[in-house]
Amino acid sequence: MSVQPVAVYALKVPAGGALIPAVPDAAAMFRVSMAAIDPDEEPDFDGHDTNQRPRATLRIVRAPPGLDLEDDSDDDYEDVDSDEESDDEEPNGGPSDKEKARKLKELAALKEMEEAMDEDDEDEDEDEDGEFDLKAAISKLVKGKGPATDSDEDDEEDEGLELDEMVVCTLDTEKNLQQPLDITVSEDERVFFKVTGTHTVYLTGNYVMPIDPHFHGEDEDEEDEDDYDLSPDEDELALDLMGDDDNESDELDGLENPRITEVDSDEEPPKLVDTKGKNKRSAPADEEKPAKQANGEESLSKKQQKKLKKNNGDAAAVEQKKEAKEGKEAKKVQFAKNLEQGPTPSGQDKKPAEQTTGTLGVKEVKGVKIDDKKLGKGPAAKAGNTVAMRYIGKLEDGKVFDANKKGKPFTFKLGKGEVIKGWDIGVAGMAVGGERRISIPPHLAYGKKALPGIPGNSKLIFDVKLLEIK
């Protein structure tokens, strides 16, 4: 099951063996990713040999299955609901009251458990078996009863209450100051932590929320360019489809009788001449062709006669016009005789496509492996630019530890040390719309330092997309 982190989880478990609830109300799902001790903390040798090396052992304690608050909470809720229906002055009601009733019950049970544990500490001489008292206290907490008593302990012993207690890790001040963990506790699961030894253990992680992989919104059919879900298989398929589209334009080259054929020639293409006037239509062919007079001389068309009048009767201008017309006919493209194929656009009508930036493929830059999946367009990102990114961060085993796929994009100033060095190297040279995979070695990422979800000396892999350059 995939989960998404939503908030930071932190818990302090002091030494001494006291049971600490993982969460106060057990109404949230969380994941523990790190356990650590403070090396500067003074060790607590109470009951321990001072000659031994200071250390702390973390244990997780789970209540037996079947002992939960759901049944009692439902009964309590029905009682509260019936009271509210009889009270006309109460304005509020509905599902939220059930949660309030359960939280109040759990807080009262926690307080009773603490009081029971305090009584056990004061009465250590009379009862040396403190673990059994803790079991009774937990039973009261889970079932929502009063403080643990001797008679209750007998009842619990008869019922055979057994706690699942497991060792998680042992930390010391010399070699093992911290330990990466991956423990996920589901909602409503009753879990406790306790520490035996000389140091307090600090637990960190995230509250998480399950992700339903089968959920599809109504607006998913609409394409959103800012949404980013880079899957290597889908990207490679998209590149293949783009390559097929490019090849389709070459199929026109196989026509037997094209209307326009290219001629290899060193002649320069004719220059376009601006014409004045609103009437841009070409004159009919019969008007352009001068008819021969009876004496063998060519007669001027009406259009040519008008031009002759504008030139004050200068006949030399007509001759120059004829020579210019003959020069236009010597074009770089020749028309075929068979025009049955219909009109086709000439090469001059095609608009030049916007140039892409970079080249596809894998390359290595300053120790960072870069695999361009899609080339962007426009200027390339350089040091000093502020860039807006979408990204998915993974470990080598494919486990996702961070992502920005929707909402506000991640922005930073390139080359200024605002991100890990591998990002400054890997994002440089991208253009808007470009997508690439960046493989960053540990020394250009977080090195030996371990972070939540990222063990020390980890190689990081990022699938990134550049949305904007400022």
Swiss-Prot record:
Major subcellular site: nucleus
Compartments where located: Nucleus
Activation and inhibition: Inhibited by both FK506 and rapamycin.
Catalytic activity: [protein]-peptidylproline (omega=180) = [protein]-peptidylproline (omega=0)
Basic and acidic residues bias (residue ranges): 268-291, 319-332
A Pfam family assignment: NPL
Residue span of region Disordered: 40-101, 114-163, 210-358
Biased composition (Acidic residues): 68-91, 115-131, 150-163, 218-254
Boundaries of every PPIase FKBP-type domain copy: 384-470
Entry keywords, A to Z: Chaperone, Isomerase, Nucleus, Rotamase
Alphabetical list of SUPFAM superfamilies matching this protein: FKBP-like
Function according to Swiss-Prot or TrEMBL: PPIase that acts as a histone chaperone. Histone proline isomerase that increases the rate of cis-trans isomerization at prolines on the histone H3 N-terminal tail. Proline isomerization influences H3 methylation thereby regulating gene expression.
Subunit record text: Binds to histones H3 and H4.
The family this protein is said to belong to: Belongs to the FKBP-type PPIase family. FKBP3/4 subfamily.
Protein name as catalogued: FK506-binding protein 4
The encoding gene: fpr4
